[in-house]
Amino acid sequence: PMVVVLLRAAASVEGPAMSVGDMDPGQAILWGKARHTARVESMVRQLRGAPAGDYACRGSDELVGGSEAMSGFRSRLLQVAEHDVPTLIHGSCGTPLEPAARWLHVSSGRRGESFVPIDCREGAESQLLLRIFGHVRNAFPGANQAVPAAIALAERGTLLLDGLEHASERVQMRLVDLLARGQWQPVGSQVTRYSTARVVAILRQPPIQAVMAGKFRRELMDQ
């Protein structure tokens, strides 16, 4: 299943996990894979001693800082980064969501590959579908040449879907197929293609609330 990272503002991430409805904006809590604390602490120490160019990318400077809260947050991103699985990041407005996704990418084994961000809040359903999955030549009137899919451009790298709760049900269900089987088809094509890209999604609405409001498919949480 998806690993979920929740961003909150406060300091401590110790103690039992809270429900999404109990959470304040900004602190980092990790749900999902096992926590390899000693290994993570070692990785954090290595990162702190590395030159900035070794791990920084555009936007990731917002996660630079020596505070205990920020160090704890980065270490939890490292915990997620070492598990090469789909990841959902949630936080309120003002939290560094896209920089967190970029940090996740450069902290993973995919750091040398492409990071392809898509803003799901922009454009109509058809435009978003074309940006994510691309289209073949003659897929529709005026499609005189094929357009590559973001998922193809992110091959072996990371595809970021920002504001996924704004994507239509049609788009989200195609993403379910992608996450479940690694399969996808460009618009206008019946040929199945396969992807090895890691998908990272950002939600600005609490996941459970988004599911209950019909804005986020529960099936995506299961992939």
What do the predicted segments below correspond to?
Residues M2-V4:
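Short beta-strand edge/capping elements of PAS-family sensory modules
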Residues L6-S12, R204-Q205:
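Short beta-strand-to-loop transition segments that serve as allosteric relay/switch motifs
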Residues A9-V64, E68, S75, Q223:
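Conserved ASCE P-loop NTPase core motifs with emphasis on AAA+ ATPases
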Residues R48-V211:
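AAA+ ATPase active-site-proximal loops
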Residues G214-Q223:
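A short helix-turn-beta junction within AAA+ P-loop NTPase domains corresponding to the substrate/partner-engaging
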